[in-house]
Every structure is written in structure tokens, then in C-alpha cells.
Amino acid sequence: MGSLIIENANLFIGVDEEVIANGAVWVSDGFIKFSGAVSDLPAGGENIERYDALGKFVMPGMTESHVHLSYNNSHPQQLNSEPLPIAMLDAVDNARILLGSGFTSAISFGSAQGLDVPLRDAINAGRIPGPRLAASDRDLGSTGSNADGTFGGDSSKKIIADGPWAIRKAIRSLAKRRCDIVKIFLDGEALSEFAPPGVLTYSDEEVAAAVEEAHIRGMRVVTHSRSAAAVKQAVRHGVDVIGHANYLDDEAVDMLEAKRDQIFVCPAIAWEITLLDRGSELGLPRDAMEQRGYQKEVDETISAVKRLRDSKVRVLVGGDYGLNITPHGTNSKDLEYFVDLFGMSTSEALLCATRDGGAAADTSGMVGTLEEGKYADLVIVDGNPLEDIRILQDHSRIVGVMKDGVMHCALMQKNPYIAPDE
């Protein structure tokens, strides 16, 4: 991998909100050797290759904390309907696009047809470009749960298990498949015929068995938990990342605050907002979605995240991209929502995407900031996202993405294997 010094950068290390003018990052064999002011560069770099950033913004790679790389940018009822070989090609393409968008890490919240594990292995082997992927498999849910057919899913998209021992067996099968993540549905979705939010679809006994079995086998547990009841159930039994958490009561907020050093929350609000704005393209007009409660869900989510922010609970960026109305590569839209809807500063939103997302994605603490000794995962941006967070949505502004000390450019081209257009 060799060594490289990136200099003359506006450097956002990601530990806090500080930006270092005329900053530098020294990368050596895939790790950060130094980050700070150019004037503080240690001796020994005189003969190292240098890259002049020309004042560009250098920041840690971001984490997509609720990813579905097997989603194929289609209607929700047509997700993952393709034959396995085509689905795998889609997933490979989606991994490239996510990395090219500045996301160097990702936490899977469900993968159809068992695509995640071979995808992760190919990325780790350097065969294809993609983010560091905490891989899952099919969604785990009970009979009649949201996993059991809200969008017409078949067995390629779900594992249905009822009772503690059936759940343990299912999780053991996921461990055998070498998954990193177990995704469990604890309640439902407003579009669900059987399980709307607030209707718990697993008992406490079942959730306790799931979390215990997963943790024994070195896997983490992420949940679909929209209601306060489902959030409290997740906290009680020690899950690792809670997806959605739209409706929170005082007790749920207090429980999350008490466990804020152990549990992360990923609101994944893009689905609700885009469903309201563009649902008519899916045959789901806005007034019908408002009647289903989606506008209320957006309003409740905004209130919930503001309360979590006040309680210093770590809130993560990402969620449910990969539909035709939320295609892969638009994931940075989440940071705009964090600023415009949740009231965060641009630097707070960026810390959610980098520092906090990295802590959730890699429990060894090796990603999320540009501190010495960590993996050299960074993004070079032509412009300052602290002045306009929307810059990160403009792929032409993502000049380069480094992962493991390897610089990737032109990943967003339709064919990234040819020289970029001048």
C-alpha cells in the first residue's frame, strides 16, 4: 500500500467539530500515521509521495448504518425479485456506488438470498470495491410479523421462527453462514396488513433468546422497532442498534439515555418522507399515506430524535435506501434531514455519519475518525459540507474516497473500469 501524505487540506478529523486549516494526513500501509496541522508533521516524511489537496475538505469516511445492498432500486413489492445471479450483480454495483458516495462502512439491516456474506468476503479480499460491511442475511420475524409478507416476501427474504428454541436454531444457522448481524422485527409497519407499529410481534422470552444466542456466537442484533413498546423491548434485552424508534414515550427515552454508551439508534426517516412526497409513483398517493399515519410518523420521529439528541443518545445516518424512490447513491440525503428536520448543526450531522457511525460499525474502534492508528478511510470533498451539507449529495464533489489506504476515484461512473472523462 505504501505511504502518502495529503496536505493543504481543510481537515475534519471527526473527534469533535474542529476543522484544521492547512491540515495534513499521513497514510502508511493502510493506517493513519498522523493527522493534524502541516506544521506538526513528524520528521521522516520528506521523501514520501505527497498529494496537494488545494484546500479541499478531507474528512473520515461515513457509515451507512441501515443498509440494504440487495435492494435493486425497484418498487417495494418487487424488491429482490430477480434471479440470484442478477441480484448478486446488483449488489456488487450497489456496493461500488455506496463507496463512491463517501460511505466507507455499512451495517446491514437485512439481505435477501444470503447475498451479504459473499459480498462482504469479496470486498474484504479486494476483488470488488465496496464499504466495510457488517453482513446480515434474511430478516428474522414471527408468523404474521412485518417480515412475513408486508411486501409480498418469500423465503428468500425472510426467516420465520416462533418460540425461543426455533429462534435459537435460526440464529445458529445465521452463525453457520458467518453473518455479523442478526436483523429482527419487533413490531411492524403502517402498511402492514398484520402488524402495524405498536403491535409487538415477539415476546420478551423470544427476544431474550435471540439476543443471548446471537451474542454468544459473536453476532450483533439490530431491530426494526418503530413503537415505544418495541424500543423498550429492544433496550431491555440488550440489542445493539435500534432501527427507526419513531414513537418514544418518556420511559423509552430514559431507558435509551441510561444505555447510551451501549445502544445506537438509526431513525431511517428517508422512507417515510419520500413515501409521502413520491408515493404516488408507487400507487400510494399522499392523502392515503397520511391516513395510514405516515405524516404523524414523520412528526413523531422529528420529536423523538430531538429528545435523543438532548439525552446524548447516539443517532446514526442511513436507512432503507435502494427503492426506486430512494435509490442507492442518494444516502447523503440523510444528513440534510438531520440538519433541516432534526435541528442539528452541519458538524453535528457529520459526526453522526462519521464518528458515531464508525463506533457502531466497528466495535474495535478502528473507523469513524482520522486519528493515528486507525484505518485510513477518508473522503476528499471539493467544497465544505460544514457550510452546505448538501454538497455531499453531489457526486462530482466527491473527488476521492480512500479505504484501507487505497484511493478510489470515478466510482460513480456507469463503467468505473474505464478512464474517467476529462
Where are these regions (language model features)?
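Metal-associated gating/positioning segment near the N- to mid-region
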Residues: K56-A125, T143, E205, H237
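His/Asp/Glu-enriched, well-ordered alpha-helical/loop segment
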Residues: I216, R286-M289, D299-N384
